Amino acid sequence: QLIRAAQQNGIRCIVDSSGEALSAALTLGNIELVKPNQKELSALVNRDLSQPDDVRSAAEELVKSGKARRVVVSLGPQGALAVDETGSVQVVPPPMKSQSTVGAGDSMVGAMTLKLAQGASLREMTQYGVAAGSAATINHGTRLCSLDDTQKIFTYLTNA
């Protein structure tokens, strides 16, 4: 109900959920950005997505069906695969020593939300999201990413 009300008022919706909540949100359609991980996407489309092309195809299906405008599949240490109507991009983070993955997904979604609001391309949005998610993993405990670490990793990714 919340997503429907927001959309009726012209508010773009971003969904980072799983299971029934993710499925229900996508049933409404026109979600601005959805960020499942590979396992969540596999459950959503009800098939194994063990190969990169399978993940890309499943994400493309969500976009082509109108359920989501952008799908960014988080792939853990392999980064993220992003798909929209213009195509797809995979962003792989630099090798880093991970201290904790707590908060990495939230950092990623927050960073991508910022870039969406700024009108960034799919590539830039995904690079910034991967940078923020990676920055969160170098912290101990439950700390989210820092702007300084995010910017450093983003610069690395844009120059790679």
Language-model-detected regions and their locations in the chain:
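Conserved phosphate-binding/catalytic region of the ribokinase-like
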Residues: 4-9, 24, 52-160
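Conserved beta-alpha-beta core of the PfkB/ribokinase-like small-molecule kinase fold
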Residues: 1-55
